[in-house]
Each structure stands twice: as structure tokens, then as C-alpha cells.
Design a protein with these regions (language model features):
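A short, glycine- and basic residue-enriched loop/turn
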Residues: 24, 62-65
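N-terminal helix-turn-helix
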Residues: 26-58, 68
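Extreme N-terminal segment that seeds HTH/winged-HTH DNA-binding domains in transcriptional regulators
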Residues: 1-35
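Short gly/ser/thr-rich secondary-structure transition/capping motifs
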Residues: 65-67, 126
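Gly/Thr-rich phosphate-binding beta-strand-loop-beta motif of the actin/hexokinase/Hsp70
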Residues: 69-106
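Non-catalytic beta/alpha edge segments that cap or flank active sites
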Residues: 22, 47, 106
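N-terminal phosphate-binding loop and adjacent alpha-helix
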Residues: 106-126
Length: 126
């Protein structure tokens, strides 16, 4: 059985909090602490790290029955991108999408039938 060190626990907690933010779309730190069963200081630290890493964004303020309005957080869907390339004669299709699978960029290029690999790569760079 593998022992968990502090680094492993922190990574697991960070992943748990990020998945909670992702699935709830807009959530407060109090909600995160309730759902994840982590302490408020742990949640605060992890959310600050993820905000600094641009994974999480402040999305506004929630409502309160008294006191300060809580800050709402949501996942930054543009924190990372995926790229897909489809090479099929006689064309190259390329797409870039964000974390919500929204197309950011889509391109189709036609290459000549006698093109070699270097010409196809050059066409893709354009």
C-alpha cells in the first residue's frame, strides 16, 4: 500500500476543488468547502493558486442575507486548448478548441496531389 505524502494530498485536493468548480459553473468558497469537506483555509489557498495559474476566474458576487456578498468563481474555459489535425487527401483540416470544446479556429487547406511531406507541413504552417 502506497503512503500519501503532503504533495500527493495537495494535488488530490486541488483536483477535487477544480472538478467541483468545473461542474458547478459558478460557486463560492463556502460552497466548495461544504461540497468537498475541506477546510476554508485549504479552499482559500487552492483557489488562490488556481486563480494565479489562470485556471479559475472570479465571475462576480453572489447574494447574501447579511454581511459581505460572496465572490463567485468559475473555471476559465480558455486556460488550455486542444488541437486536432485531419490529413485526408487532398486536404488538411485543422481545428483548435477550448476546454468547453468550442471551436476557436478552424482551417481547411487543399494540397496538390503530388505534394511531398515537406510541402504538406509548409501548407499547415500557413
Amino acid at each position: 500500500m502506497k503512503k500519501n505524502n503532503l504533495s500527493d494530498v495537495k494535488k488530490a485536493n486541488r483536483q477535487l476543488v477544480y472538478e467541483c468548480i468545473w461542474s458547478h459553473k459558478s460557486v463560492t468558497m463556502t460552497d466548495l468547502a461544504y461540497v468537498t469537506h475541506l477546510s476554508r483555509p485549504t479552499i482559500t489557498s487552492l483557489v488562490q493558486e488556481m486563480t494565479a495559474d489562470n485556471l479559475v476566474i472570479k465571475s462576480g458576487y453572489g447574494t447574501s442575507n447579511g454581511g459581505r456578498n460572496p465572490v463567485l468563481y468559475h473555471a476559465n474555459v480558455n486556460a488550455a486548448y486542444a488541437m486536432g489535425i485531419d490529413l485526408e487527401f487532398p486536404k488538411v483540416r485543422m481545428a483548435i478548441s477550448n476546454l468547453e470544446c468550442e471551436n476557436i479556429c478552424f482551417s481547411v487547406r487543399i494540397y496538390p496531389k503530388d505534394a511531398d511531406k515537406d510541402q504538406v507541413l509548409q501548407l499547415m504552417k500557413q
